[in-house]
């Protein structure tokens, strides 16, 4: 298959950054307690919406942890990413676990999704952990979803909003830059992975709903790491296990409520194709 060639974009910058980190990505993040909590929350949300044997299109698949999980639950996953390094890690895992028949993958930009229509239609389009925050053209990306889905197909996205309560409170620790980085970010804010820089944009649930309202109906929004601290507050769960478990229980009760569903590090949003 001919490899797609993409012009230089911010998405390319992000892909280059994550390619540089791909070899150690799982080592860095695979054992983190709060990251494991986030994955469990997202996966539980998705599994409630999927019929057996669903056909999933995954965006920004990374090293393939979610692809392997959903394939292991009996679904077929077509995993995409623009990072060659991340796809290399996914390919290694697919071969190691003998999942060639249930996981396919290819390099694809968010803005090139329409060419995947012939490989669909899909029951679910899934994007985890803020991959879509790496594009300043989210409106165009969202506009490409409906033709890729079956009637009543689902979109589930995990996105960074414009306000995070925990992050804003870091101002009291003197971390002014981190505490304010989501503010005034209309033109994107600089992010760094290792020594590579790219821009990050923040989008509230209302933005997603507005851009999809013609073709989709909202299923629900839940806050993620809204009471539980973000995973970049290193060692929190290990240093304060009782507090962490208490906060987990509180988040489980509050994740669907206002304002908690809107003020987390992320939100999980699902919509159904009309």
Place the predicted regions along the sequence by residue.
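A short acidic, Gly/Pro-enriched loop at the edge of an enzyme's catalytic core
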Residues: 115-125
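A short glycine-rich, Lys/Arg-flanked "PGG" loop and its adjoining helix->strand segment in the class I
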Residues: 139-154
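Short alpha-helix
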Residues: 196-221
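Conserved class I S-adenosyl-L-methionine
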Residues: 2-51, 65, 69, 154-185
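A C-terminal cap/extension of S-adenosyl-L-methionine-dependent methyltransferases
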Residues: 210, 220-274
């Amino acid at each position: 298959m001919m490899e797609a060639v993409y012009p230089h974009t911010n998405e390319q910058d992000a892909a280059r950054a994550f390619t540089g980190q791909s070899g150690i990505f799982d080592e860095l993040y695979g054992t983190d307690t709060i990251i494991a909590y986030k994955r469990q929350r997202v996966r539980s949300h998705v599994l409630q919406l999927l019929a057996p044997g669903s056909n999933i299109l995954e965006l920004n698949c990374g090293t393939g942890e979610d692809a392997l999980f959903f394939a292991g639950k009996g679904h077929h996953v077509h995993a995409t990413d623009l990072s060659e390094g991340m796809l290399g890690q996914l390919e290694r895992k697919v071969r190691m676990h003998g999942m060639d028949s249930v996981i396919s993958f290819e390099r694809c930009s968010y803005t090139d999704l329409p060419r995947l229509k012939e490989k669909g239609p899909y029951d679910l389009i899934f994007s985890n952990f803020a991959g879509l925050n790496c594009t300043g053209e989210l409106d165009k990306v969202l506009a490409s979803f409906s033709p890729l889905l079956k009637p009543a197909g689902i979109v589930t996205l995990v996105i960074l909003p414009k306000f995070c309560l925990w992050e804003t409170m870091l101002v009291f620790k003197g971390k002014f830059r981190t505490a304010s980085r989501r503010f005034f970010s209309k033109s994107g804010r600089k992010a760094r992975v290792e020594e590579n820089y790219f821009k990050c944009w923040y989008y509230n649930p209302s933005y997603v709903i507005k851009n999809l309202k013609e073709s989709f109906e909202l299923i629900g929004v839940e806050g993620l790491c809204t009471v539980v601290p973000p995973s970049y507050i290193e060692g929190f769960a290990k240093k304060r296990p009782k507090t962490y478990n208490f906060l987990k229980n509180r988040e489980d009760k509050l994740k669907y409520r206002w304002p908690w569903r809107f003020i987390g590090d992320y939100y999980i949003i699902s919509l159904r194709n009309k």
